[in-house]
Amino acid sequence: MNLEDRQALGELDARLRTMLPEEYQDSYEALQPVPMRSAGLKYGPDGKVAWDEIWGSFCDLAMAGGPPHKGALLEAGTRTAIAARPARYAEVTAELRRGVEMVTELPTELSPTPGWIRVTCLNETMARWLLRAIVMENVAVRREHHMLDLPAAPDFRLDKEIKNVVTVIAKTCHYWLGHTPRAQQRAIGDLFRAMDDESPAVEPAVVEDSGREAVEALAARIAERIATETGLASSARRYDGWLGLECPAERTAIWLMRALVASNVLSRREGTVLFVPVNPAGDPEGDTVVRSVGRACRIAVARGLL
C-alpha cells in the first residue's frame, strides 16, 4: 500500500469511528452480519399494534457491518398504484405515521410527494446520519433539510412492509439518540460539513418516468468505467437511481459500502452486490462515484479484500 492509500485508509477509518456509536468504534472490522430473530407484533387493548412495546433490543447497525434489515430494497409506491387504491393508501400512511410517532416521538405528516410519509428530525445532522443509516438497511429514504421521507405504498402489509419501515426508523433513532452522545453528534455534524466542502454528497436520483432514460444511460456509463478501472462487473439487479456491482464476497461488499459512505457517497448492499447511486443532477457524469469506488477498491486490494 503506497503512502497516498495509507493516508486515505487512515482518513476513512477516522471518519467511520466518528460516525459510528461508541460500542462499534473498535469492533466494526470484526463484526459479522448475523441476523436476529424477528420480533412479533404486539397488540394493545384497543386492538391496534403497540409499536412501542415490540422491541427489547435491536440487531447491529448495517453501517457497522450488521445485517441490513431488508434483503432487497423496500421502495415507495408509484403514483399509478396509489391512484388505483387511495383508501388503502390512506390506511397504510395512517398506520405508518402512528407507528413512527410511537417509537420515535418525532412528528410526522404526509410528504408532498405521493409514496412517502415525512418525519421531522431534531436537526439536520440527525436527518443526515439517519439517511445514511436507513439506506444501508435497504429501506428507501429521502432527505430535505431536517426532514426525512420514508416509503409508503397501498400494498404494504401490517406485519411486513409497514413493520419494516417502523422497525428501521426505531432502530436507527435508538442508536442515534441512545448511543451517540451530544459531543459526538456535534462532531458528526462537523464531519458532514467538511465532507461537503470536499465533495457534495451523492444520493440516488428521484426517478420520474420522463427522466428514467437519462438515469439508465448514466448508470451504463458509470458501470463501464468502474469495470474498466476496478474489474467489478455490474449486477443484473435493477433499481431506479442505483447501480449494482458484483463483489467477490460479502466481506468485500460491506467494506466498500462503508468506505463509500465515509466518502460522502450513499451506498448499500444486498448480499455480495454493492449498490452505488446514480444521479444526473448531483453527479452529472458519475465522476464522483467512479473516483470514490476506484479509491475504495485500490485500498481494498491492498488490504487483501479484492
Residue ranges, per PLM feature:
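Short amphipathic alpha-helical segments
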Residues: 88-92, 126, 161-164, 214, ...
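Hydrophobic beta-strand residues in large extracellular and virion-surface proteins
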Residues: 100, 119, 148-150, 226, ...
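Generic non-transmembrane alpha-helical segments
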Residues: 95, 99-103, 129-133, 137-139, ...
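Short charge-dense sequence patches
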Residues: 40-48, 77-86, 112-124, 203-213, ...
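Conserved PLP-dependent catalytic core of the aminotransferase class-I/II
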Residues: 65, 69-72, 76-108, 199-234
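PLP-dependent enzyme catalytic core of the Aspartate aminotransferase-like
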Residues: 2-58, 148-209, 273-306
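Conserved PLP-binding catalytic core of the aspartate aminotransferase-like
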Residues: 93, 106-133, 219, 232-259
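Intrinsically disordered, low-complexity regulatory segments enriched in Ser/Thr/Pro
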Residues: 128-155, 160, 253-280
